[in-house]
């Protein structure tokens, strides 16, 4: 009942509109001396989160406009119709949660307050009447009902309550807590007090609870304040803090400090952030150290304070005792972001967040409903509290990589060729890529052209024959994605090839034959006979006759001797007269002069002594003493010395002409 007005007090009827509603609401307020202010209207209208406007005649456009009322002392104006009219426009994202969300209902909070005060006359059945408890929808994500125990009086939030191991819905979540025998709870609480508390704060597991009562939002959830302290004309910050379960709370406010002069910080408020340093991921000592550094810097400080709604001061003596017994886990960033997103979604659907007082969800349609077992729920709960183990993160990364590989389309000629080359360069591609030897020269990480053609036919979706595969391989060679060992420009199946630069990793592209484990890598050498030069042609072989074998003699020159004639001696690898792999260097030029039925190094008219093939040295061939001109032969050059013997025991024949008796010649047989 409204108190009677005095002589200087009068009642004024005010009509107000909420948002876009056309039907006004009426409220009777008291005004002194006939002057009504916004503060008088707020005394009767207790909802917050609105902007207030009144109609006023604008002299410029000669029409009524809506003028915002910002302070409580602003006077209410009459419209042209002679009535007091106020237009209320809701503020988007006001507070931290939509109006249809909350925590515990008022009877439930009352029960928990009585438990904290250890009252002997506790009413154990406040939920017996189902009509008194509003319907509450709880999103039952895996392990989330365990987190709800964090709001109880238990000092061990990780204790698993057997009464909550169920998958019921609606308003039955808190019923076992209220209907339990209080003597047993007190004994359990006293035993748990002896256990060592967790020193670091735990991550918050958010839960979504929708209630039909609006008072639970206004009085149950904290308000976040941003307080700016200039620190100019004050001697110190004047703030003492304490840590409770990893959270930072104000324990004392010193007089004449910046906090006392501001007046908005009270004992028991939680400090969430100082300047740009958030306390959500810091331990208690780290947060206190950050606060001490900010206070000693003598610079302006911005505090983010969480103020919990409490009852009258007479209900309890120490505010910190209440905070210690009821530590509410809070993730402010996720909280605010979720609230704004839900509000915007409701507006997009044409729903008014302020008018949604209840949410009805059919059975089995909860978006995060989980049918996991108790062990799975406990595992998921531990992961969300303590973080996901490294092994699970690596397994998830491997699974994601495998899924991405499955999404890659099949290898075709239309995709980037470098993808094809990298696919064949993988260790499990099926292409034989390994270290090989050719003419005692190490060819690291090479493969044969024939194997490449086979791989393309097997793995390319649009290549079905070897001819098309050879054409595609030639394109890879021309693009530089694969390279010939001796820089040939045409592709053949009988040559060695290596990958281009950047295809193989550093661990596989290295020329070092030592593996990562410290052992020597096995190098494969070709088992086929490798000729330095070509065998004798068929016509020349017929002239040799008598089953006289010929052999190739090499010199003592270094295999890396400089030779400038390789450009004109490069031939195709597929010559039928040459060996498959040795033909990369070209054919040999056989210099011979038939004398009788065997080959000699000189004739009768040549009086210069020619050394035996086994005695030919680089100096004798270079200065022309060997009787053969041209550049010095090497094992990789085409100018070689050929000696044939009529004796099958591999004897080298050399005619040594005596200068004194030119008519008599003698043959000396040198055994090689």
UniProtKB/Swiss-Prot annotation:
One Pfam entry name: DEP
Q: Where is the DEP domain?
A: 427-501
Gene Ontology MF term list: frizzled binding; signaling adaptor activity
Which Gene Ontology terms describe the biological processes this protein takes part in? canonical Wnt signaling pathway; cell fate determination; cell fate specification involved in pattern specification; cell migration; embryonic digestive tract morphogenesis; embryonic morphogenesis; endodermal cell fate specification; epidermis morphogenesis
State where composition is biased (Polar residues). Answer: 98-108, 660-672
Instruction: List compositional bias (Basic residues) regions by residue number.
Output: 191-202
Q: Residue ranges under compositional bias (Basic and acidic residues)?
A: 160-169
User: What effect does gene inactivation have here?
Assistant: Embryonic and larval cell fate, polarity, division and migration defects. In several lineages of the developing gonad 42.6% of hermaphrodites do not have either one or both distal tip cells, which results in the absence of the corresponding gonad arm, and germline proliferation defects in the male germ line. Defects in hypodermal morphogenesis including disorganized dorsal cell intercalation, eventually resulting in 2-fold stage arrest, and failed ventral enclosure in some worms.
Q: What is its main location?
A: cytoplasm
**Domain annotation PDZ: ranges:** 226-294
Start and end of every DIX domain?
A: 9-91
Annotated InterPro entries: DEP_dom, DIX, DIX_dom_sf, Dsh/Dvl-rel, PDZ, PDZ_sf, Ubiquitin-like_domsf, WH-like_DNA-bd_sf
- Region spans: Disordered: 97-127, 150-174, 187-215, 604-672
Gene Ontology, cellular component aspect: anchoring junction; cell cortex; cytoplasm; cytosol; plasma membrane
Location in the cell reads: Cytoplasm, Cell cortex; Cell membrane; Cell junction; Cytoplasm
Q: Which UniProt keywords apply?
A: Cell junction, Cell membrane, Cytoplasm, Developmental protein, Membrane, Wnt signaling pathway
Task: Write out the function statement from the record.
Answer: Plays a role in the signal transduction pathways mediated by multiple Wnt genes. Functions redundantly with other dishevelled family members throughout development. During embryonic and larval development, controls cell migration and/or cell fate specification of hypodermal cells, hypodermal seam cells, vulval precursor cells and, through distal tip cell migration, somatic gonad precursor cells.
Any notes on this protein's domains?
Answer: The DEP domain is required for cell membrane localization.
The UniProt entry's sequence similarity note says: Belongs to the DSH family.
Q: What is this protein called?
A: Segment polarity protein dishevelled homolog mig-5
**Organism listed in the record:** Caenorhabditis elegans
Q: What is the lineage of its organism?
A: Eukaryota, Metazoa, Ecdysozoa, Nematoda, Chromadorea
